[in-house]
Swiss-Prot record:
The organism of origin for this protein: Aspergillus aculeatus (strain ATCC 16872 / CBS 172.66 / WB 5094)
Name of the protein this chain belongs to: Short chain dehydrogenase/reductase AacuD
Practical and industrial applications: Secalonic acids show unprecedented anticancer activities against various human cancer cells and might be interesting for further derivatization, targeting diseases such as cancer.
Residues that, per the record, bind NADP(+): 37, 180, 184, 215
Gene3D superfamilies in UniProt: NAD(P)-binding Rossmann-like Domain (3.40.50.720)
Top class in the EC scheme: oxidoreductase
Family of the protein in this entry: Belongs to the short-chain dehydrogenases/reductases (SDR) family.
EC numbers, comma separated: 1.1.1.-
Length: 284
């Protein structure tokens, strides 16, 4: 069992693996859509690219720093989904001018997935360097902030959807993660502001905790037996469901991929009555 299953949640059901409701009956229509995924060449980001490719979107743009994994991701996606155009950009999301240029080159983007992140060394707060703390906030907060600003300035005929891959560390004290947890909390609150201040319902912004997966980046910080690892298809299919028509009432909310979507839909009245429900903040 994952350590995260013990956290309080608004749904009775906790999924640790994907399920038919989001894997097969997600109601997302990918026809003609362009998806931009930062950090999309590996791990959760790559699994999200796979999920959207399965929905027959027109284009998937992957932004990541490492050319090798990026080329491998492109080749694998093209082999499995030859009708989907895969475009790649080797760039750091902290290069704000470059990211704005990528958006301009792509043209209309229907779904922006913010998955790129940095995790510092697992050390006490007294041992984290100023450079590590700065990097956590540069990559995890400022880069998504600038990218969403640039995205909102672009023109899209339909709905714009921002999906921010957050972390349970945003809502809890994660030992030896004094930079990572606060940076993810800050980014999630920034997304809540974009959602609350939106000029039109044609913009939807979501943040969600993806789960625990033994990816190469996670292996740099955790042992294989440190927790119960989960199905990486779960956050991918949940992200795709968020991009569909059923999730609009959850605009601005912080969610978990593990929460059953039909049970979330059953909470719609409460969500619409209480603007603070399912957000990062103080509950008394």
């Amino acid at each position: 069992m994952s350590k995260f299953e013990a956290f309080l949640r608004p749904t009775q059901t906790y999924h640790s693996r994907t399920y038919d409701r989001i894997s097969k009956h997600h109601n997302f229509n990918g026809t003609g859509k362009t998806i931009l995924v930062t950090g999309g060449s590996s791990g959760v980001g790559y699994s999200i690219c796979q999920a959207f490719a399965e929905a027959d979107v027109a284009r998937i743009a992957i932004v990541s720093r490492s050319p090798g994994p990026q080329a491998a991701a492109k080749a694998a996606l093209e082999a499995a989904h030859p009708a989907v155009q895969i475009v790649t950009y080797a760039a750091s999301i902290t290069d704000h001018a470059r990211m704005a240029a990528i958006l301009a080159e792509l043209g209309p983007v229907d779904v922006l997935v913010l998955c790129a992140a940095v995790v510092h060394r697992q050390v006490p707060a007294t041992a984290i360097t100023a450079a590590e703390m700065q990097a956590a906030f540069d990559v995890n907060v400022l880069a998504p902030f600038h990218l969403v600003q640039a995205y909102l300035a672009t023109t899209t005929a339909g709905t714009k959807t921002v999906i921010h891959v957050s972390s349970a560390a945003a809502q809890s004290r994660s030992p030896f993660r004094a930079g990572y947890g606060p940076s993810k909390a800050a980014a999630t609150q920034v997304m809540q502001h974009f959602a609350a201040e939106r000029a039109s319902p044609a913009l939807r912004v979501f943040s969600f905790h993806p789960g625990a997966f033994y990816t190469p980046s996670v292996a740099e910080h955790y042992a294989p037996d440190s927790t119960g690892w989960e199905d990486i298809n779960l956050p991918a299919h949940f992200a795709r469901w968020l991009a569909g028509p059923e999730s609009g009432f959850l605009n601005g909310r912080y969610l978990w991929a593990h929460w059953d979507v039909d049970e979330l839909i059953a909470l719609r009245d409460r969500v619409e009555r209480d603007s603070s429900f399912l957000t990062i903040g103080l509950v008394v």
